[in-house]
Amino acid sequence: MVDTMNARNTQFTKAFHALKQNAGSHSPSMEDLKKMFPTLEIKIDACYLSNPYASELVLDYIDRELIQTNAYKKVLTHYPSQQRSLQKVMAESLHVKPENIFIGNGATEIIQMLLQQEEVQKVALMIPTFSSYYEFVGKGCEVVYFPLNERDDYSFDADKYCQFIENEQPDTVVLINPNNPNGAYLSLEKMHILLKRLAFVPRIIIDESFIHFAYEDEALTCLSSTVLFDMYPNVIIVKSLSKDFGIAGVRLGYALMDSRKIDALLEHGFLWNINGIGEYCLRLFVREDFLKRYEEARKQYIKEMCRFKEALLGIENVYVYPSMANFVMLKLPSRIKASFVISALLVEYGIYVRTMADKIGVEGECIRIAGRTREENNCIVMALKSILKDSK
């Protein structure tokens, strides 16, 4: 039985590896997987990072307000609002000036746009990190890496990082908080200390794509770095609403930055870079009725993530890296290949997780698992225990 499973998984692993190479440093989409493996039934998507409870909330609004009323026809056939109009919509909720808001087709579009500006000539990054930050830099741009230590759980030493920046003198510094792929978090207090020391850096990009899943008190208060943008003129904040709302397919994000940078961008495009469905979801962000329910979904998800992480800690011989995001990075026993576990999860259980094999700076056999609903998380834990037990 085990030998049959191993043979089937080995064959699948080779085919999946080829598909992964075509996808670059990102995971193959669900559609690409279904196309290559027609008989594969993916039951749980624990690869892509979004809040499943928020997904259901947004779908409920879309169903009631767009589908049942036939309003979706206007959303699909009419031009969406332009960037300047949507800036004013977001300003109501963020309490910042409209001219300081840039709305993007997902956070990735914003990252690419920021890193390909002519003035960006030297970028400082921590590794491991989100691959787009070193893939999207402009031609001729130098990238310097600050390696996070595996022995310290890839946590962030602000003092050492400041020394590194002072020595390297980059014009652009990137901070992902919580970090991807390990979920390490830097508190708001420590962030203030860091930014004061790095006041000499022309621009600091703070990517908060996962900040809604972090917390600093028992009330799980929603964290915001808008105050950082107000206090430090060199700071640019990047946010992903796709992850917050659980709507990765819509592609929606925004950034807070100097109005002059936004004016320069809008001179060369980005007039209608958000589609009609994206605009509808964006307008939910400023509605009190939606935000009240979203806050309930956000806290429900955080509580489930805490329970899920505790359950993962109970798996024998697996190391669980501390995380304040909606995902967890696991280090497998050295005798077990991550590729085998990923294939076994997909083939035998229909669970899709992320390999860390292509992540610069990650040591050992590691996988990343996104948190899902309680029922789905229970299935993930059960499947992992079974696979690792059979692999002894």
From Swiss-Prot:
Pathway: Cofactor biosynthesis
Cofactor(s) named in the record: pyridoxal 5'-phosphate
EC number(s) from the headed UniProt entry: 4.1.1.-
Superkingdom of origin: Bacteria
Molecular-function annotations in GO: carboxy-lyase activity; pyridoxal phosphate binding
BP terms from Gene Ontology: biosynthetic process
Positions where N6-(pyridoxal phosphate)lysine occurs in the chain: 243
Keywords from the UniProt entry: Decarboxylase, Lyase, Pyridoxal phosphate
Amino acids binding O-phospho-L-serine: 180, 354, 368
Pfam families according to UniProt: Aminotran_1_2 (PF00155)
Effect of residue 242 to T: Increased enzyme activity with of L-threonine phosphate and a decreased activity with L-serine phosphate. Exhibits similar activity rates with both substrates
Region span, Required for catalytic activity: 22-29
InterPro entries recorded: Aminotransferase_I/II_large, PyrdxlP-dep_Trfase, PyrdxlP-dep_Trfase_major, PyrdxlP-dep_Trfase_small
Impact noted for substituting residue 26 to A: Significantly decreased enzyme activity. No effect in pyridoxal phosphate (PLP)-binding
Catalysis: reaction(s): O-phospho-L-serine + H(+) = phosphoethanolamine + CO2
Bridged cysteine pairs (disulfide): none
Gene3D superfamilies: Aspartate Aminotransferase, domain 1, Type I PLP-dependent aspartate aminotransferase-like (Major domain)
Role summary: Pyridoxal phosphate (PLP)-dependent decarboxylase involved in the biosynthesis of norcobamides, cofactors in the tetrachloroethene reductive dehalogenase PceA of S.multivorans. Catalyzes the decarboxylation of L-serine O-phosphate to ethanolamine O-phosphate, the precursor for the linkage between the nucleotide loop and the corrin ring in norcobamide. Less active with L-threonine phosphate. No activity with L-serine or L-threonine. Has no aminotransferase activity as no production of L-glutamate with L-histidinol phosphate and 2-oxoglutarate as substrates.
Subunit: Homodimer.
Family (UniProt): Belongs to the class-II pyridoxal-phosphate-dependent aminotransferase family.
Protein name as catalogued: L-serine phosphate decarboxylase
Organism: Sulfurospirillum multivorans (strain DM 12446 / JCM 15788 / NBRC 109480)
Source organism phylogeny: Bacteria, Pseudomonadati, Campylobacterota, Epsilonproteobacteria, Campylobacterales
